[in-house]
Amino acid sequence: RRSSDLIWLGYGVHGNESSGPNASVQVAHHLLTSTDAEVQDWLKNAVILIQPSLNPDGLERFATWANMHKGKSPVADPQSREHIEPWPNGRPNHYWFDLNRDWLPLEHPESRARIAQFYKWRPAVVGDFHEMGPNSTFFFQPGIPTRTYPLTPTANQQLTAKIADYHAAAFDKKGRLYYTE
């Protein structure tokens, strides 16, 4: 296959953003069971790789804490114990490192394994799914221009802007709140 046929969907680089890993199962189920013509076309013309948890140790730490401290009915008080995850929380990996900061240095086993697979598969599209807090609206790129890494190719920035425009139009159509900076 050509690399243009490959899509990589990665969820939960921050272990305490559990919506991503949970959603990955639903995405896989949808792709496997949908009879929608558009979905069938995707599957006919592309390989979709799903990595359900980029940070399994952080996710396990968070799940253990959440199962001990959160109830079935959420508590509105922001000072309630269910809203205050202790350190080390689920964000970092086993070594208490934020794997979202390890894409270039590749110091950790999860990152090295992920990049080895990137080099093997060479995906054309990479989805890196995060979760916002319960009191936040949605964020999507391109974000603040001064935070753009100087060696990021212009074509990447242009594609990111097109994707952002697509999301903005969809959110505007539904009246959903979001921010990009």
Which residue stretches match the model-derived regions?
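Solvent-exposed loop/turn segments at secondary-structure junctions
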Residues: V13-S18, L54-L59, L104-L106, E131-N135
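Metallocarboxypeptidase
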Residues: L49, A63-T64, M68-E181
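Conserved hydrophobic helix-helix packing surfaces used for dimerization/oligomerization
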Residues: L6-I7, I48
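Short glycine-rich or small-residue beta-strand-to-loop segments that form or flank ligand, phosphate
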Residues: I7-Y11, D98-N100
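Short, small-residue-biased leader/transition segments that mark boundaries at the very start
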Residues: R2-S3
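Short helix-loop-beta-strand segments that form the rim/entrance of peptidase-like active sites
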Residues: A23-N67
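Short alpha-helical patches at coil-to-helix transitions and adjacent helical residues
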Residues: E17, P21-V25, S111
